[in-house]
Amino acid sequence: EPKHFAISLTGEPTLYPKLNELIKELHNRKYSTFVVSNGMEPGVLKNLEVPTQLYLSVDAPNKDLFEKIDRSVMKDGWDRLNESLKIINKLNDKTRTALRFTLIKGLNMQNPKEWAEKIDLAKPMFVEVKAYMHVGFSKQRLKMENMPTHSEVKEFSKEILKHSDYKIIDEHERSRVVLLMKEDFDGRVMTF
């Protein structure tokens, strides 16, 4: 029987009008909840029934790259994302929070200081720095060459950390992901 529910798979979960009720019901049944958002609905995040873990996906460190990569239909998408980062900061004492940086070789692996500024704004418990993977619909827009190697992800993570008080805590080479935290803690479980 499942114990953990990921609320993220297709589309943006914060657009689901009964998200709070879903999270409450899952918690009543003693399940953990894992919500992954693109940050375009900060008002929903602000009033969200607190999940067990809240992830915010970040694909760009600045407005120009955000507009190029995310191509949000919302004209104020960049502002919405930054507002959501501030909300993550306020939720840190209520739930596990994480930023997920997806690195795309040849596109957004630049401006490490600006990536660090996103960490500083949200101050999440975890930052996952991961490689773009050439799968699904993304294959229509990007190439196999846009997938950074694990060593490239790790090296770029180190560049980000020159501007941050976080540090590399863990990594998983096959998944091409590096975990950043301020400090590790007992009981942390590697889920990748």
Where on the chain are the PLM-derived regions?
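A generic structural signal for alpha->beta connector loops
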Residues: 30-32, 51, 94-96, 165-167
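Conserved non-cysteine loop/helix-boundary elements of the Radical SAM core domain that shape
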Residues: 9-22, 61, 65-86, 105-114, ...
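Non-cysteine beta-strand/loop elements that form the S-adenosyl-L-methionine
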Residues: 46-65, 124-133
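Glycine-rich loops and low-complexity Gly/Arg-rich segments
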Residues: 30-34, 58-62, 78-83, 122-126, ...
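Active-site beta-loop-alpha junctions enriched in small/polar residues
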Residues: 10-12, 38-40, 59-61, 102-104, ...
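Conserved Radical SAM active-site core
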Residues: 1-51, 86-89
